[in-house]
Structure formats: structure tokens, C-alpha cells
Amino acid sequence: MKSSLLVLPLLISMSSAAAAGLSVRFDEGAPKDRFTLTNSGECNLKQARVMLDLSSSKAGLIFDVTASGAGVEVFQPLEFVKGADKLSRIPQVRDGDNRLELSIAQLKKGESIAFTIDVDDTLGGQEIIVSDSEISGANIQLSAGSNKLSGTFGANAVASIDGIECSN
């Protein structure tokens, strides 16, 4: 019986596959808002796509990247401040867009990609300032190989995805 109990934890650890994970954090800033994507999993993310979708956010959020268009007052174009070299291409964002897709070439365990951009709400509140709770309901989708998972931003302005099995 004792030897069976000693072997059980070993069998459990052998049977659980390593999983990829992603955490996305939104930080309101003036004049630039910031998104930080961190590989929170146990393996590298390779050839992955991340879709940041603000269309279902509580405040109807949009990207404000030009002086004229859908945004309000201050605008800020998309600017990568960390990890741009982890992308296979830099995405294009138009004023008023509510989606942004990132094509990740490789993001190692613990590494981050961060970018700044202006985010405005469209529901007539304080449009140039987005509170943490206003991004709640927005989604992220992670596609890697045949796996596709999604996560939703909570009132804490964080969305997380876990559970994509690591590939070799």
C-alpha cells in the first residue's frame, strides 16, 4: 500500500500535459492606453494568432488612432513598446476599429508583448478615459495550430486563457 501511494503523485504528474496560456492586461493611461500580453503557460507559443475584440465590451470600446474619425479628442496610433520582434507582422489599425489581430511568431514562456494605443468608449460617458470595468466583456481569442480558446476581460481589466496543449 505504501509503495502505491508513493507512485500515485508520479503518475499524476506524468499524465498531465503541459499547457500554453496567455494573460492580457489593459492599463488606462493618459494619453496612451496600454495592453500587455504575457505568455503565462508552461511552454512557448509558436505560430499563434491573438484576436483582441472590444466589440462586446461594456462601454462599446473602439481604437482612436487618428485626429479625425470615430474617436474623441486625443488620439494615439498603435505603438509597440515591448516584444514587437515576437510578431511575424505588425498589424494595421484604422480609426474606429474594435478588433486587433496579432500574429505571434514565437513568444517564450514568461515573455511579453506590449503596445500602446488610444481606446475610447462610445456610450457617451467619459469617452476619453476608459475605466477597468468598461473593458469588461471584451474578448481575446488565441489560435495555435488546431486549438482555439477564448477569454473575457473582467472588471479587473485582465483576460486569461489556459489549456492549449503544448506542441513539441
Cite the ranges covered by each PLM segment.
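Sec-dependent N-terminal signal peptides
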Residues: 4-14
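Low-complexity, acidic Ser/Thr/Pro/Gly-rich terminal tails and inter-domain linkers that flank the onset
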Residues: 17-28, 44
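Short, solvent-exposed loop/turn segments enriched in Ser/Thr/Gly
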Residues: 28-34
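Solvent-exposed coil/turn segments that connect beta secondary-structure elements
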Residues: 29, 55-57, 120
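Short edge beta-strand/loop segments characteristic of extracellular beta-sandwich folds
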Residues: 36-40
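Structured domain cores in non-transmembrane regions
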Residues: 43-116
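Internal, hydrophobic beta-strand segments that form the core of beta-sheet-rich folds
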Residues: 100-103, 113-121, 132-140
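Glycine-rich, aromatic-bearing surface loops/beta-hairpins
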Residues: 126-168
